[in-house]
Amino acid sequence: MHTRAIYPGTFDPITNGHVDLIERAAKLFKHVTIGIAANPSKQPRFTLEERVELVNRVTAHLDNVEVVGFSGLLVDFAKEQKASVLVRGLRAVSDFEYEFQLANMNRRLSPDLESVFLTPAEENSFISSTLVKEVALHGGDVSQFVHPEVTAALAAKLKLVKP
């Protein structure tokens, strides 16, 4: 276990599926950097600073996990972090084609950077940040899909605090 890995994503917000993969990656690698992307093509509900703070709170129990916001190319961020592995999650076959293209592009840009794919636990296989936000936006209970810190942050952000 000598390898430094990066688990990149938008994490808007972090879900139980993300946490499942982070916990498993933390067992596989010496150090895991959660790279929270400031992706200008997406319009996140939470600011980069809010996402970094939420992910820090949710992963505080993992000693070998660090949370860092970044912008720019992922391969450049990986070099800065001295990481040799990208951890990516595959929820369904529909994720595979995009992830396959992304892995090949990253390999072209940085031949020493390997992509490793983890599948979520069955109970998390359908959870996505987009679905969680949609349920929360319509007043649904998302507590079974996200950490209590995230439930509270979503309620505050969406002004759906219930009495």
Curated annotation (Swiss-Prot):
Residue numbers binding ATP: T10, F11, H18, G89, L90, R91, E99, N124, S125, F126, I127, S128, S129, T130
Q: Which Pfam families match?
A: CTP_transf_like
Q: Report the SUPFAM superfamilies cross-referenced here.
A: Nucleotidylyl transferase (SSF52374)
Do you know which CDD domains this protein is assigned to?
A: PPAT (cd02163)
The subcellular location is: Cytoplasm
Q: Which residues bind substrate?
A: T10, K42, L74, R88
Has keyword Protein transport? no
Q: Which reaction equation describes what this protein catalyses?
A: (R)-4'-phosphopantetheine + ATP + H(+) = 3'-dephospho-CoA + diphosphate
Q: Which InterPro entries match?
A: Cyt_trans-like, PPAT, Rossmann-like_a/b/a_fold
**What EC designation does it have?**
2.7.7.3
Instruction: Tell me the subunit arrangement.
Output: Homohexamer.
User: What does the UniProt record say this protein does?
Assistant: Reversibly transfers an adenylyl group from ATP to 4'-phosphopantetheine, yielding dephospho-CoA (dPCoA) and pyrophosphate.
Q: Any idea what this protein is called?
A: Phosphopantetheine adenylyltransferase
Q: From which organism does this entry originate? A: Shewanella sp. (strain W3-18-1)
Gene name, per UniProt, is coaD
